[in-house]
Amino acid sequence: MEYGRYAPSPSGDLHLGNLRTALLAWALARRSGRGFLMRVEDMDERSRPQFQERQLADLRALGITWDGPVQIQSQRTAGYDAAFASLWERGLLYECYCTRRDLADAARAPHGAPGVYPGTCRDLS
């Protein structure tokens, strides 16, 4: 099954921008027959459990539901490590020396698919 997801950062209460993003992600997933996951990105030092609880309660109160348990980013490091190891073993990881500006400029260039890394540093290391 394919999934949509919403990944809030619990560094404050839910605001209108968060709600808009959550509602769009949820509606698109449900309308297209996909599952919907909630993944809390709690790695930011400003994250607080009380904000997470309030944000999730607000979303539930508005009828936004998700499939399965809430996924907590800080509790998924073993999965991330396994994914990294798999990519490394297949030779698909490499260092990128581009600055954020280089990447932003490449994204604005009139070539290639939007949002796709152009591979500038792929063969340097």
Where are these regions (language model features)?
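NTP-dependent nucleotidyl-transfer catalytic core
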Residues: 1-125
